[in-house]
Amino acid sequence: MQISRFTVDLPGAFSLKGGGILENLTDSLTRSGTIGLDMVTRNLNFLTGLTGVTPDGSLVIPDSMSLKMKMEMNGPQYKAKLDLKEGKGSMNVNAALNSSTEVYTADLKINDLQLHHFLPKDSIYELSLSADAKGRGLDVMSFHSLANLNLSLDQLHYARYHLSNVHLTGNLKGALATAQLTSDNELLKMTADAEYNLAHSYPDGKVTVDVTQLDLYELGLMPKPMKRPLAFNLS
């Protein structure tokens, strides 16, 4: 089945182009297909009212935002790609899943995305980060499931605070979830390690936190800078 190229143009709101092809949809081994969509936004703020959010300007959908999506299917293998551009910022997402083996991968890249354009009444601004995940098995309680997660926060501007060099890694193996968080910036220098056994019916985990520098003055919690940085260890 071929999906003819189509165009949807709602003046003042958005324009959408797309098309694709689908074959053997009822056969789980030989089915295949590709669908692509290109969208450019104009004024979509009427959608915020449909979601139940009060249309007070606290949440908006920016004008002239470009969104491209592509979805592919080949037997049990599924792939999806999303590219978003808003002003000088961008977001790219890639994901893949094999429904037979339950093997999956995903990666996310956000570069200079201006969150203030989406939340104009909040004090949140530029965001840059990258993340990737891969694993096997969709049941996190299963001893056979495996997963790895990596996340790096390169830049987050919130109010007068600038966060950077924050890294999170996570692993799942044998129903044991482990995570490590590190932060190395002027506001906070720390490491944290945690683990939790998902197979037990009772809470079974531990956390260790080592803070070598916490700037309470920059956080607005102290009237003047401290002579020595605050440091502590918790476990």
Give the location of each predicted region.
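Interface amphipathic segments
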Residues: M1-S235
